[in-house]
Amino acid sequence: MSSVSIVDYGVGNLLSVARAFQYFDASVNLVSTPEEIMSADRLVLPGVGAFEDGMKGLTTLNFIEPIKQFARSGKPFLGICLGMQMMLSRSTEFGQHEGLDLIAGEVVSVPSHGVDGQLHKIPHIGWNELVSTSEGEDWCHTILKNIPLNSSVYFVHSFMAMPSNPKKRLADTLYDGQAISAVIKDENMYGCQFHPEKSGEVGLSIIQQFLQI
């Protein structure tokens, strides 16, 4: 049986994430100590809300260094929504805030308009398609294995991750033509801007692939 540890730091939809992994009979642990993070087989960092609040939650519980050490260990790591954004170096959300710096880059606001110049709704909420990126790696040996191009997943966000190295962008989505990082990857580390636990069969397939790494 595969096991996965989900970081419990007071910010995130832990139960829905846990249920998605339990669908595949995974052993799910909600971890609330640095020691539990370090002993995990696979680690998931979920999160909803503001970047600053998320980082404060991790700092208060002394989770910053254990998460960094886990990420460097080579074991599978997945950030979801805010959890993905915190993987980057910094965020410009309501000021300048330092992130975990697992992947070099910055979190910036989603463009307020499409490529045609027309204003669109922020936050970006709803189903949108996954598309390949020009410089990212092939999906066949990643958590997107078996995911067809243009599969739809569920987004809820006002900010987006911009890795410094475009090769770290595994998949994008297009919001009125504006490219947004949907999945980022650096070796053992993955981040999903969308919510796989709310994305139907496509999301469940991604979770299943993460359990098989």
Curated annotation (Swiss-Prot):
Its EC number is 4.3.2.10, 3.5.1.2. InterPro entries: Class_I_gatase-like, GATASE, Imidazole-glycPsynth_HisH. It catalyses: 5-[(5-phospho-1-deoxy-D-ribulos-1-ylimino)methylamino]-1-(5-phospho-beta-D-ribosyl)imidazole-4-carboxamide + L-glutamine = D-erythro-1-(imidazol-4-yl)glycerol 3-phosphate + 5-amino-1-(5-phospho-beta-D-ribosyl)imidazole-4-carboxamide + L-glutamate + H(+); L-glutamine + H2O = L-glutamate + NH4(+). It is found in: Cytoplasm. Pfam families: GATase. One of its GO terms (molecular function) is imidazoleglycerol-phosphate synthase activity. GO terms for cellular component: cytoplasm. The active site is at 81 (nucleophile), 195, 197. It comes from the Bacteria. Residues 3-213 form the Glutamine amidotransferase type-1 domain. One of its GO terms (biological process) is L-histidine biosynthetic process. Keywords: Amino-acid biosynthesis, Cytoplasm, Glutamine amidotransferase, Histidine biosynthesis, Hydrolase, Lyase. Pathway: Amino-acid biosynthesis; L-histidine biosynthesis; L-histidine from 5-phospho-alpha-D-ribose 1-diphosphate: step 5/9. IGPS catalyzes the conversion of PRFAR and glutamine to IGP, AICAR and glutamate. The HisH subunit provides the glutamine amidotransferase activity that produces the ammonia necessary to HisF for the synthesis of IGP and AICAR. Heterodimer of HisH and HisF. This is Imidazole glycerol phosphate synthase subunit HisH 1. It comes from Legionella pneumophila subsp. pneumophila (strain Philadelphia 1 / ATCC 33152 / DSM 7513).
